[in-house]
């Protein structure tokens, strides 16, 4: 049975964004790339004027996996100011990283928004 907001617990998080409510979800990378393009070119009405943000990362925990990749768990906190309104968003996140020469590539990112009662459209720069 599909979970409805009215009968779900605020302590049970979305596991399947295709079937349950997810505040930000792109089926593939091209959707996210399109959103970034619209923001960079000024074609996204929701981002005029662009917000001022401050992103804080803490409690970083790194675990090397058997295949040489890394699983990185952390907590994040974003402070957001736009149109005379200040807001904050926060939660835990998990990254999967794979080595790429002298650097690392993000192969998966899962950010959980803990204060999910929002007053406006949520976008990726909030996370």
Name what the model sees in each region.
Residues 66, 76, 110:
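A broadly conserved detector of short glycine/acidic/proline-rich loop/turn motifs that flank catalytic sites
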């Amino acid at each position: 049975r599909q979970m409805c907001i009215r009968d779900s617990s605020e302590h049970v998080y979305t596991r399947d964004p295709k079937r349950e409510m997810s505040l930000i979800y792109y089926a593939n990378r091209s959707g996210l790339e399109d959103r970034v393009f619209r923001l960079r070119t000024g074609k996204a009405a929701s981002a005029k004027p662009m917000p001022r943000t401050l992103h804080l990362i803490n409690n970083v925990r790194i675990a090397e996996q058997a295949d040489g990749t890394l699983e990185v768990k952390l907590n994040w906190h974003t402070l957001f100011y736009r149109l005379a309104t200040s807001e904050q968003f926060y939660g835990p996140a998990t990254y999967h990283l794979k080595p790429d020469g002298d650097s690392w590539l993000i192969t998966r990112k899962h950010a959980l928004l803990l204060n999910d009662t929002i007053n406006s459209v949520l976008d990726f720069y909030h996370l």
